[in-house]
Swiss-Prot record:
This is dCTP deaminase. One of its GO terms (biological process) is nucleobase-containing small molecule interconversion. The gene is dcd. It holds the Pfam family DCD. Pathway: Pyrimidine metabolism; dUMP biosynthesis; dUMP from dCTP (dUTP route): step 1/2. Catalyzes the deamination of dCTP to dUTP. It is an enzyme of class 3 (hydrolase). The active site is at 137 (proton donor/acceptor). DCTP binds at residues 111-116, 135-137, 156, 170, 180. SUPFAM superfamilies: dUTPase-like. It comes from the Bacteria. It catalyses: dCTP + H2O + H(+) = dUTP + NH4(+). The lineage of its organism: Bacteria, Pseudomonadati, Pseudomonadota, Gammaproteobacteria, Legionellales. Belongs to the dCTP deaminase family. Its EC number is 3.5.4.13.
Length: 188
């Protein structure tokens, strides 16, 4: 496998709709001043989260069960910032919609700005021919509330080209998260 460069990422985004909306170069400021950067980088793409958040709460004393997840365990918030309680987590989605080519596997890593504050971003790989908005999971590992900024960079996508094309893609097997557009809860 080889990692793909900024030139390849830009070409695939502009000519094949791999990332939409797409930002060429890094954006580090907006009308309000400095922000956490997003856009294409040397060997990746820094994504933004939207202003749709689901903040985990255990007001119902539920057991966290991925096979039978209780939607009432979340509070929906629409805001330019999300405050995650101590030792808790929140879900969000990317602003960007992805269409992953059949010969590409995409890995997501959290941005160091958040990691250095004890905020971990977790996303599973984007498989060949998967498409949709990426559901992001933010874990607050600290004993204090933590802030996430909507419309700013939160994670970096790395694009890896396979040595050969897979026999069965995510689309071929009708993956359960194919085409997701909102913050998507666990499915079985």
């Amino acid at each position: 496998m080889s990692i793909k460069s900024d030139r390849w990422i830009e070409k695939m985004a502009l000519e094949h709709g791999m990332i939409s909306p797409f930002q060429a170069g890094q954006v580090r400021e907006n009308q309000n001043g400095r922000i956490i950067s997003y856009g294409v980088s040397s060997y990746g793409y820094d994504v933004r989260c939207s202003n749709e958040f689901k903040i985990f709460t255990n007001i119902n004393s539920a057991i966290v069960d991925p096979k039978a997840f209780d939607e009432n365990s979340f509070v929906d918030v629409q805001s330019d910032v999300c405050i995650i309680p101590p030792n808790s987590f929140a879900l969000a989605r990317t602003v960007e919609y992805f269409r992953i080519p059949r010969n590409i596997l995409t890995i997501c890593l959290g941005k160091s700005t958040y990691a250095r504050c004890g905020i971990i971003v977790n996303v599973t790989p984007l498989e060949p021919e998967w498409e949709g908005h990426v559901t992001l999971e933010f874990s607050n590992t600290t004993t204090l509330p933590a802030k996430i900024y909507a419309y700013e960079g939160v994670a970096q996508m790395l694009f890896l080209e396979a040595n050969e094309v897979c026999a069965v893609s995510y689309r071929d097997r009708n993956g359960k998260y194919q085409g997701q557009t909102g913050v998507t809860l666990p499915r079985t």
